Amino acid sequence: MITKKDKPLNIYCPLVSIIIPVYNGANYMREAIDSALAQTYENIEIVVVNDGSKDNGETENVALSYGDKIRYFHKENGGCGSALNYGIKNMKGEYFSWLSHDDIYYPNKIEHQVNILNKLDNKDTIIYGGYELIDEKGSSLRYIKPDSVLPINKLNISLLPLLRGLIHGCSLLIPAKYFHEIGIFNEALPTTQDYDLWFKILRVAPIHFDESILIKSRFHSEQGSKKISNHNEECNVLWSSFLHELTEEEMIKMEDSPYLFLTRTATFLSNNTPYKKACDLANTMAKQVLHDTKVSVIIPVYNRINWAIEAIESVLIQTHKNFEILIIDDGSTDDISELTSICKKDKRIRYFHKKNEGPAAARNLGIKNAIGKYIAFLDSDDLFYKDKIEIQLKFMEENNFIFSHTSYQKINEKGKYIESVHSGFFSGNVFPQIIQTCPIAMPTVMGTLTLFQENLFPENIRSGEDCCLWISIASKNSIGGIDKELSKVRISGGTNTFMDPNKYSVGLINITSYVLNDPYLSKFSPFTINLLLAAVTQLRLLENKDYKKSNISFFNNNYVIQKIQTYCFVTKILILLTITSIRQEGIRATISRIQRWLRKHI
């Protein structure tokens, strides 16, 4: 027990005022007052405010029976808020602790909370916790534990526990300074005056959750809110005002994004309250947040203008209308007049021209000029489904992902269906497995602008540069996957990795080199072994007689074709040599050997 006499010089021992408002409460108030008097912390005062009780003096007689053990005040009836305000105006303490006349404090309620304050640097912190629910006779019903609903870190975000119904007013220990700075209870609100004031105070005050149960809250039929007919309407108005007053920054602090805050608030209101109007408002505001979210679509273009126009058109018909298109012309040599004409006609399209440096540099230029909250990538020969952005945006906002991808469909040069690729299953914490298997296709990707501003594409790599970036991002973040086809990837000759074993092999080798040269990623170098083996295996495709008949520009020289056929037999033993090299000389030496072989022979 801490007493004023025993107070050590280095122990914070402030005067705490316990305010007990009461109206016709003779049936329960003695238990409440006794629990206040039984506090193990002695530096307290007990202020009882009789709010004009009309019970033939029964309430007053109970209060007067305590003599000078309490400070007793009588006033005209004005409601609970007015009684609390009267107590606040007459309290002498540095801290306020509310005790309803029908509730009970555990003996250590005040001492325990003051002990917490002693451990905190900021003595202006509000302390709160859970409570025990009891019935009319005082029998325990259950324990209400906020930490079973939200993690501790969330419970210490000032407004969030209030807006999830987790704060009981009698569990609070509040510095009196906030009544002077923020104000007192709104007496015009018969049943919501507490939440109204807590909302105002908690917008500026820090809070600290403590898991100890320190109060007993009585549930009975005579409680004021149950007897006031317009209670639900008053609550609807109050909650609606909360939603309108909260800033974007406050919503982000509570739930990481305005959309998440609004949808989770709507869910809370729907599941736990009858406040339908406030719930509908939260849902409406959430939809508006999505509508107002701009997505930047980056399309690098190098020749093949007709396909680029098709790609642009697939964006223009999106069901989500708030987007911009950044066309990055990577030094095209074809006639681009039709493309530039389309760009000039739509203010949502911005055109950039640069010298040819490869798709990585083109995408990076787009990232540096994007203004959307999210970025989506679309290669100029690929297509979006019309609801691609809408579905992916909602998925990311709902699940708080900063990076996501989807399943997709392969099409041929004429746009005809080839097959579906269900890559969207690849999600969650996929690192380091993503090093050896990365199924993420470029036009399926969407991420936050901030993410890509901090993680640009490696411009020194022209094949496999996308996978290198996905690996880097996955090493630090969870990946969101949607197993729904939302993009079409065109499979064509010449420039497409799917059709070019050599390009695919070089891409795998580039990825391996990227991993090995990164200080962090290189710790997971064993995962690159399969990449090397896959690269060598792909070279076997060069033995295919039909391959030399393809229109792939790399092989349009007969001399090169003859060189390939001459050295193709090497691939039959190259896998075994690679395995031996890895075992004896390591991955770095092996990758260098393969790169030299490719440069020399292919």
UniProtKB/Swiss-Prot annotation:
Per the UniProt record, the source organism is Rickettsia felis (strain ATCC VR-1525 / URRWXCal2) (Rickettsia azadi)
**Which GO MF terms does the UniProt record name?**
hexosyltransferase activity
Its organism's taxonomic lineage begins at: Bacteria, Pseudomonadati, Pseudomonadota, Alphaproteobacteria, Rickettsiales
Could you tell me what this protein is called?
Uncharacterized glycosyltransferase RF_0543
What family does this belong to? Belongs to the glycosyltransferase 2 family.
Under the heading InterPro entries, the entry gives:
Glyco_trans_2-like, Nucleotide-diphossugar_trans
- Classify the source by domain of life: Bacteria
Task: Tell me a GO biological process for this protein.
Answer: biosynthetic process
Task: Kindly state which keywords UniProt assigns to this record, in alphabetical order.
Answer: Glycosyltransferase, Transferase
Q: Check the record and name the Pfam families matching this protein.
A: Glycos_transf_2
Q: What are the EC numbers?
A: 2.4.-.-
Does the keyword Glycosyltransferase feature in the UniProt annotation?
A: yes
Q: Top EC class per UniProt?
A: transferase
Q: Which residues form a coiled coil?
A: none
PANTHER family in the record, alphabetically? Answer: GLYCOSYLTRANSFERASE, UDP-GLCNAC:BETAGAL BETA-1,3-N-ACETYLGLUCOSAMINYLTRANSFERASE-LIKE PROTEIN 1
Would I find Secreted among this entry's keywords? no
